[in-house]
Amino acid sequence: YKEGDGIICTGWRVGELYYGGYSQYAKVKGEFLVKRPKNLSAKQSMILGTAGLTAIQCAFAVKAREELLLQKKVVDVIVTGASGGVGSMAVMILNKLGINVTAVSGKKENHDYLKSLGAKNLINTADLDKDARPLDKGLYDGAVDTVGGNILANVLSHIRDKGIVAACGNANHYKLNTTVMPFIIRGVKLWGINSVDTSKKRRDFLWGELPNLIDFSLLEKSVKEISLDELLNTYSQMLEGK
C-alpha cells in the first residue's frame, strides 16, 4: 500500500485482541487490510463494516445452490433478525439478487423499513421462538439466520429439499435444539459463516461486490454518526435496548 490509499480493516479480532478498534490511528498487520473500492467512500465502508461482509457471505452461501435458481423462477429465502445490521443488509442483497425474501423481526415499527429494503413478506419473531417440530411444511429454499436458538431450529424444519441455511449469530441462543430430520430427509445444508478470519483474497472479491448490491440512500436512514467521546454512553444505551 502507498500513502493515501483508501483501505478497509474489519475482523481479525481488531479491537478485541489487537488495539485500534475505535481510534483515529491504528497499527495493524498488512494482511488485515483490503484496498477500498473506488466506488465506496470511507463512511460507506464503515456503514457496511463487519455486518456487511457477513451479510454478503450469507447471501452468496444461500445463492450457491445454482441448480435451484435454474430450476425455479422464484426462490424463497427467509432472513431472521432482519432488523439488525447483518439481517437488514442480507434482505437488501438477496432482493438485489432477485430472491423473494421473507423477513423475521420482533420490531413491528421496522416492518415498513424492511419492506423498503426489499422484503416481500414479514413474520413476527415470536411466531418462530418456540419448540420446533422435527420437520414442518417446506416453505423456503434457503435461509440467513442471525439469531440461533429455537428460531434457527424452526427455520431448519421449514427448509425445502436441498436448501441451504447460512448461520452467523446467536442473539436468540447459542444452543440448537433440532433433529437430524431436515438433513437426512430433505438434504438441508447448515452452513456456518465466520467473517472474522475470511481470507484476504475472498475479502477483496466481496468488498468489490458490495457497492453493487447495496442502496446506501436506504441504509443511511438507519445510521447515526457519533464522536469518540460518545462511545461509552452509546454502548450503554445499546445494552439497555434503546
Model-found features: residue ranges?
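Glycine-rich phosphate/adenylate-binding loop and adjacent beta-alpha elements
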Residues: 1-35
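Glycine-rich phosphate-binding loop and adjacent beta-alpha segment
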Residues: 17, 150-216
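Local beta-strand N-terminus motif with an aromatic residue
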Residues: 23, 119, 139-141, 183
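Short amphipathic alpha-helix with an adjacent loop that forms part of the alpha/beta core around
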Residues: 128-138
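C-terminal hydrophobic helical "lid"/dimerization subdomain
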Residues: 201-242
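Mid-domain Rossmann-like dinucleotide-binding core that forms the NAD(H)/NADP(H) cofactor-binding site
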Residues: 46-125
